[in-house]
Amino acid sequence: MKFQSEYYLVDIDGTLTDYRPGACAPEKLLHGNFLLPIIRDLMVEKGWDKTEAEKAIFDMKERGVFWDYTEFIAEFGIPTGETFRRLRQWHHDNLIVYHDTVRLIKKLAGQGKQLFVMSNNPYMGCIFKLQAADLAKDDFSSPYFRRIFGTNILRGCKCVPDVWKRAFAQIPAEIPEIGVIGDNPKEDGELPRSLGVKDIHIIPRATIARGIDREETKK
């Protein structure tokens, strides 16, 4: 594959990392999320009743559609360092890392390409996955990515055209000069192509347990 663009938006799930089979089994989730049980457990350790903690998490999640995990830390006063440690450990234990694409990202960055994360995860979710793939440091910085466009940054997921437009508007280049690297033929291929992206690289993956797939990706 030839990577001719100077700027690339790079997907995470299915491209750089994926969930191990069973990692996101329904019985392990809280309100449809695999990390919220960690938030709840920390709240219980702080003195919350379990049921009340789960309700408080749900209410906060519903109030702000495009939330990030740091908001739960701030709202409920759970210890920041321990929360980050457990969230990071979850990713270490439950993610598959696609080393072929990780090597590609490091190579492109070494060539001076300007790389940006384009993900359906909130900002901190992106960070933890990049850390698991050795693409971000413990202080949350990344020597490979200029910006991280999570769902709370762009106010939506990649299945929405306006979300792509908001990402394009934050890159100092015209849309035809921006490339995309991902695994989803629709979200990472057809949609950005319809908006004017020309340099698109879809990395095929064998069918494996993908954790929680949104309905849009199943069509």
Regions found by a protein language model. Give the residues of each.
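Active-site neighborhood of HAD-like aspartate-dependent phosphohydrolases
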Residues: 1-52
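Asp-based, Mg2+/Mn2+-dependent phosphohydrolase catalytic module
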Residues: 1-10, 102-106, 113-219
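Short histidine/acidic/glycine/proline-rich micro-motifs that form metal-
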Residues: 16, 23, 58-62, 91-92, ...
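Flexible, glycine- and charge-enriched loops at secondary-structure boundaries
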Residues: 28-32, 94, 157
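A metal-dependent, Asp-based hydrolase signature
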Residues: 34-88
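Charged, low-complexity C-terminal accessory regions
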Residues: 61, 94-96, 126
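Short, acidic loop-to-helix structural element flanking the phosphoryl-transfer center
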Residues: 67-76, 85-117, 161
